[in-house]
Amino acid sequence: MSKILIFFIILFSALQSYEIKQTPIKFSQKRVELTKQYIRQHYGLKVEDIKITPQIILIHYTAIEGFKKSLARFESETLPNDRPDINKAGSLNVSTHFMVERDGTIHQLMPLNYMGRHVIGLNFNSIGIENVGGEGFVENLTVEQLLANIFLVNYLKKRFETIEYVVGHHEYRCFEDTELWLEKDDGYRTKKFDPGPSFMRDLHANIKGFKKAPCD
């Protein structure tokens, strides 16, 4: 992305105000109990609730082009049978705190202080942002989504002073040798491509005060 375009993105994002639409997925006591079970199984922690202290903002794409289809993947409380890559790791369905449409519309799907299942090893200390797009693992997120993500990470930093990192899903394994990594199953890893290095480079070029993934 050119320096001129980045300048206009910074200028526009400073002036832009966003509404966060409340679009809650189903999160009954059943999902809470499944989350506790996941925490015990994968992190070796016995918890009374599923509240988190976020230190990482984890950026994703849905790998599905439509908002309604993307949202539907998170609605069920139990994991569908078409996810053999993660089915063995528990019946808790995936979830995310936010979803951003192609036009930049922002939806909050679940409480920000609840743990969602959206990344191996880092769920217990991260907030997830899913961006609609990336079908076929193509880096095709929009400028509107970039602007919305800039707004969201700054909004979340104001809400949670504990947040330090803004990281792409494809970078999650860079945390394996850090204190933030909690996964106990050495055989539970998947290869991720989202949202891709270009989007993360543009995002970090337009935000300040956040650490990148410790990949070097």
Predicted regions and their residues:
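Sec-dependent N-terminal signal peptides
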Residues: I4-S13
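Basic/polar, cationic surfaces and motifs that engage anionic cell-wall
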Residues: Y18-E33, E135-D216
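Macrodomain-like recognition of ADP-ribose-binding/processing modules
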Residues: Y18-R40, D49, N93-F98, D103, ...
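Short, conserved "active-site rim" segments that organize catalytic pockets and cofactor/ligand binding
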Residues: R40-I106
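Solvent-exposed, acidic/flexible segments
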Residues: I50-I52, S91-L92, V119-L122, V138-L146
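Short coil-to-beta-strand
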Residues: I57, I120-I129
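Solvent-exposed loop/turn segments at secondary-structure junctions
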Residues: A63-F67, D103-I106, L112-R117, G133-F137, ...
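Short, solvent-exposed loop/turn and secondary-structure capping segments
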Residues: K68-F74, L109-P111, G121, T178
